[in-house]
Amino acid sequence: MPEGFQSLNQTLPSAISSIAHLESLNDSFILGAKQSEDVSPGLEILALISVTYAVIISVGILGNTILIKVFFKIKSMQTVPNIFITSLAFGDLLLLLTCVPVDASRYIVDTWMFGRAGCKIISFIQLTSVGVSVFTLTVLSADRYRAIVKPLQLQTSDAVLKTCGKAVCVWIISMLLAAPEAVFSDLYEFGSSEKNTTFEACAPYPVSEKILQETHSLICFLVFYIVPLSIISAYYFLIAKTLYKSTFNMPAEEHTHARKQIESRKRVAKTVLVLVALFAVCWLPNHMLYLYRSFTYHSAVNSSAFHLSATIFARVLAFSNSCVNPFALYWLSRSFRQHFKKQVYCCKTEPPASQQSPTHSSTITGITAVKGNIQMSEISITLLSAYDVKKE
């Protein structure tokens, strides 16, 4: 057996077992378990885990902080889609600043340092952050659906206010769904399947409650993964269908103008789809592993090296989702890329005067266009005011 896996087999049972019961990332945290033998993780493995978590935290905080700063500092970036994306960044920051460091600490020390109250608070924050991420992506997909499939229903006069209200509702719903975690999460006694030891850990239910384990894992998988992604898939199917039809049905005299509008919305929809795909890929192993544990281990936890390796991989991948969104935007959005570079290089130059707010620009355009075709100008203003690709 490779030396790395031999070292893994000798890791603290508490560090292994505390990973074994989680929901979305609400897992069991070790609380000063006494071991039957004096063993500790290999230094190479411990260093690798520590560096990985440090990179996730540092990169995630940097990227999301710059994203939020760009949104509040650059007026042209304060559009409907960007309000949701900024809300998503706040949720990611919450996870990175609280849950990721706590999770990393389990590999450095073998005692839970945050008490019973910390168990409840961390459980609540973890599930709230997951809810904010997936539900914001769902609402953002619905917004793209309305922008492309039903553009005449857009209300630009109060779009920003309504969008802020929706973002707040997403946070409230996420906190309400996470509230039971804070209520029922507590310190329970766990045992190791390969070592004759028991220990206290933070979990949303006692390990001996088979029905609770299975029900909890299924509800988390459905509410925080399957149902939202199914809704998003339905929205994007309708979006793709509409864009395909519009390619062949646009009038010849409006071909150039309509083509620009369609391309603009396609790029924004593509950006949202990439964020959704990143969430789905990053969180799927975590959910699968939790379902497997819930239906397999009821009285003890698996402390094998392979199980530990799979768990660390799933956790790191899930946490990574909180730091990749800003860099996906950097890759997909030219305007965000420009402002991101300015913030990184500490450039304090103000944006050109031509980069006015979408509402101001559309108003001027509307006043000029009224002299020509009033009806068409009103529709064009509505479609372009907050959904121009250069101002996602």
Swiss-Prot record:
* Sites of S-palmitoyl cysteine lipidation: C346
Intracellular or extracellular location(s): Cell membrane
Q: Which SUPFAM superfamilies match?
A: Family A G protein-coupled receptor-like
Q: Name one Pfam family in it.
A: 7tm_1
Protein family per UniProt: Belongs to the G-protein coupled receptor 1 family.
What does the function comment of this entry state?
A: The relative rank potency of bombesin-like peptides for this receptor is [Phe13]bombesin > [Leu13]bombesin > GRP > neuromedin-B.
The name under which this protein is listed is: [Phe13]-bombesin receptor
